[in-house]
Amino acid sequence: MRILFVAAEAAPIAKVGGMGDVVGALPKVLRKMGHDVRIFLPYYGFLPDKMEIPKDPIWKGYAMFQDFTVHEAVLPGTDVPLYLFGHPAFNPRRIYSGDDEDWRFTLFSNGAAEFCWNYWKPEIIHCHDWHTGMIPVWMNQSPDITTVFTIHNLAYQGPWRWYLDKITWCPWYMQGHNTMAAAVQFADRVNTVSPTYAEQIKTPAYGEKIEGLLSFISGKLSGIVNGIDTEVYDPANDKFIAQTFTADTLDKRKANKIALQEEVGLEVNSNAFLIGMVTRLVEQKGLDLVIQMLDRFMAYTDAQFVLLGTGDRYYETQMWQLASRYPGRMATYLLYNDALSRRIYAGSDAFLMPSRFEPCGISQMMALRYGSIPIVRRTGGLVDTVSHHDPVNEAGTGYCFDRYEPLDLFTCMIRAWEGFRYKPQWQELQKRGMSQDFSWYKSAKEYDRLYRSIYGLPEAEETQPELILANQ
């Protein structure tokens, strides 16, 4: 199938959040499965610093009374064709720039639609988040082009109809929706980034005021878990960790723990229970729970704790003050560093992720990949990727709790701390986690089924994953 991904982000050249990871990784795997997948992205001012872009455009268009150009390149590290939408509005050297985002991304979406109508005609346009929400509305006029809309962040829903009416053409049947809701209504298929979150957003607690619409279109709504790049994030070959290891050589992993303790200033003790946390310091990630109970947990146990991340100033200050109370046992790094994050995944015994809500989550999959046992709240994608440890039946991959309460988190962490004492059982738990398949190939198979369902096509024959992953 001919498929065009239209998005505001694409790793590794333009990434702010998880959407960039999806758009940067999924197309290259789908191409190896036989699809002709291409990406349509804004031509940001910083892109020439990150990749080679031909000087001359391949096409010139007109949208919303504006001239624009389209340049063709290749997404670095892949064979995925990349179309770059050129307009002065995207010259600033950052992806999101505040007050003019509604206008910029409506123009971008309109330009993508014109490109598909007049230059390269895909069978499916795969739209991502509110930035591209008008495309399914406009494509409703083109029955030979279908649309898939992926919700990465339901909280941001884009401009409303009254604003869109002033700057572009809106069909009368769009009613009063914002761009997110319009896309949900008019796309041929809608998905979010985990099955559990797809169910949760149909409720008032998670639906961000459009739960009624999401329930109404539930027949075309599904959830597909994101993947991680298992070639880049591989403890057997990771050059950023002190000692490489596999599930069969877990004894080597201890060297990473000692190296991490030395690097972040913790007391060097391979028997200490070391919890890691790599996160944005915001309420969504459960920081209010952590602040309420971490002092009690550190006082009650002999555990160690290391935090890496940035976010709200309040949470940064609170975590910094907590760390000062436990020198040698707690370290806080208020920054983001990919190499250090890998060393935390590889050196920690457990990984804390008590999210208030979590559409998918990547960190818990990274932790499992590197043998760190997740401690998570059962919500969204965490339900779909981490199962509760059952020592009797030798099942599960982590420690889970349900209620968003400090005592529930404290109890769950105590269980993990106590479980760490039983080293043979803990190693089996690590092996189960490391054996989980979080590759993009697994996600790509689900998207392939989704695309085929639009046209009533049968599922594709099984392709050997090793042939695809070997070339990622």
Swiss-Prot record:
The record's section on Pfam families has:
Glyco_transf_5, Glycos_transf_1
Decide whether keyword Kinase is in the record: no
Known EC number(s)? 2.4.1.21
Per UniProt, which keywords does this protein have? Glycogen biosynthesis, Glycosyltransferase, Transferase
* Matching SUPFAM superfamilies: UDP-Glycosyltransferase/glycogen phosphorylase
Q: What is this protein called?
A: Glycogen synthase 2
Write down the species.
Trichormus variabilis (strain ATCC 29413 / PCC 7937)
Pathway entry: Glycan biosynthesis; glycogen biosynthesis
Say which family it is in: Belongs to the glycosyltransferase 1 family. Bacterial/plant glycogen synthase subfamily.
Enzyme class, first EC level, given as a word: transferase
Entry function: Synthesizes alpha-1,4-glucan chains using ADP-glucose.
Q: Name one GO molecular function term.
A: alpha-1,4-glucan glucosyltransferase (ADP-glucose donor) activity
Q: Where does ADP-alpha-D-glucose bind?
A: 15
Under catalytic activity, the entry for this protein gives: [(1->4)-alpha-D-glucosyl](n) + ADP-alpha-D-glucose = [(1->4)-alpha-D-glucosyl](n+1) + ADP + H(+)
- Provide a GO biological process annotation: glycogen biosynthetic process
